[in-house]
Amino acid sequence: MRSLLDDPWLKADTIVIKPNWVGTDRSYGFTECEALHMLLEALDGRIVVTESYSLGRGPPDGGMKFTADGKEVDWKWLFMGKGWKWLEKHPDWDWFKEGGHWDRIRKNDRWFLDEYEFTDLFNERGVECVNVTEEVWQGRKADPHEIKNIVETRFPPAIREEIYSCVPRRLYDLRGATFISFAKLKKPYRDIISFTLKNFFGMLPDPLRAWWHQWFDSSLIDTIKVYASLFNMYGICEGLRYIPWWKKTKRIINDLGILAFGRDLVSVDAVLCGLVGVDPEKISYIKLAEETFGAYDRRRVEEAKAAATDWFPF
C-alpha cells in the first residue's frame, strides 16, 4: 500500500483518519482492524483517529431502556419508525446524557475497540483517538464563530449553523494537517451510496443522526465544508479483505484487494459509482458536492462503467 499512496499530503507530520465505524454488522460493512493496520503501515506521520459514538456500535443487545412518550423502550427502538420520529423531535440528547446512557455508550465503545483489536493496534502504533461526541458534549469544542468565519471565506454559509458547533477543539488545533476519509467499499443497496463523502456524516456528534437526516444532503455537505476548510482532504475507499455486496440477497465477497484513493473525493466517489453500477448523476448529495467542491470527469465514470464487470464479475 505504501507504494500506491505516494502523495505528498500523505507524508504530513500529522494525519487524521476517519474510519467507517457506524456499526459492527459485517454484512453492512465497517472498517476492520486489518485494513486500518495496513493503512497505518503505509504512513509515517503521527496518527489521530477520529469518530463519533454510535448506538449501533456495541454488543448485540437492545441497549439501555428508557421512557419515551410514556412507554418503556430501548435504544433499538430508536432505529425504527416511531423511535426515529421521536428522536427527530428530541435533538438535544439531554435525556441520554442525564440517564446513564452516556456511561453505557462509553463502555460500548471500549468494548468495540477491544473486541475488534483496535485497542492493541492503537497502543502498538501510538495512535491518538479523538471521539467527536465525547469532545463536543464535554464542551471541548472549537469556537463556532471561528469555524463559521473560516468556512465562509471559502464556501457558501451552512444551511444550519449548528454545524459550526460540532468541531472538537483538539481537531481544530490540528488544522492544516491531512485528513483521510477511510471508507468501506460496499455494493449499494437501493442506490444508497456510502463511500468517502458519506463517511463524513459520522463527524456529527449525535450517536444516531435522525435529526440531521431530515436534511441529509445539506447536513453532509456542510460537514464536509467544515473539514475541507481546516484540513487537506484525502479520500480512500477500501475493499481489501471483504466487501458487502447486494444482488437480490446480501453476500460477503472476500479478498478483492481493491483500493480507490485521491484528493478529489467527489471524483473518487463518482468513479466508484460507475464501478458498482450506479449513476452518480442520480445521487443527490454527489450532485450537491459537485456544485460545492467542483465537477468530476464524466469520461472517467464512463470508463468505470465499462470496466465494472472486470472488477466485479459476480
Which role fits each region the language model picked out?
Residues 1-314:
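Extended, low-polarity segments enriched in aliphatic/aromatic residues
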